[in-house]
Amino acid sequence: MTFSVKSPILGFEGIKNVEITKIDDFFVKMQDKDGDTSFTMINPYSLRNYEFDIPTYYQDLMQISDKSELQVYNMLVISSPIEESSVNFMAPIVCNTTNMTLSQVILDPVNYPQYSQAEKISTLLKKK
């Protein structure tokens, strides 16, 4: 699926269009359509209870309504073994599959103290 990036991906502000490809039930690959940059992301719901409110700014930017179909992913920093990889829960990638738009939503740490920028998968697996 190809998405138009409506809010820049931190550190990769030049990326305007991405292709998201499912790897398996847990992981997806996000590839810059106009370059060589790619990211591995994870379905956060496979690891933990993960809830947040999408700020109005992003809702307007992505034209999110009650009827919008959304998917949420989190960026991974891959390590070996995979359980040592870290997940950024503070900046989810929100995909509106209704209009094929995407934004990286930056969460306020004051409102979401339970999430961090670099939480190891192994820590999350122990909590389950």
From Swiss-Prot:
Gene symbol of the encoding locus: fliW
Organism, scientific name: Campylobacter fetus subsp. fetus (strain 82-40)
Family of the protein in this entry: Belongs to the FliW family.
Domain of life per record: Bacteria
Keyword Endoplasmic reticulum: no
Any one GO cellular component localisation term in the record: cytoplasm
Subunit structure: Interacts with translational regulator CsrA and flagellin(s).
Function summary: Acts as an anti-CsrA protein, binds CsrA and prevents it from repressing translation of its target genes, one of which is flagellin. Binds to flagellin and participates in the assembly of the flagellum.
Compartments where located: Cytoplasm
Protein name: Flagellar assembly factor FliW
A Gene Ontology biological process term: bacterial-type flagellum assembly
Record key words, sorted: Bacterial flagellum biogenesis, Chaperone, Cytoplasm, Translation regulation
InterPro entries registered for this protein in UniProt: Flagellar_assembly_factor_FliW, Flagellar_assmbl_FliW_dom_sf
Cytoplasm recorded as keyword: yes
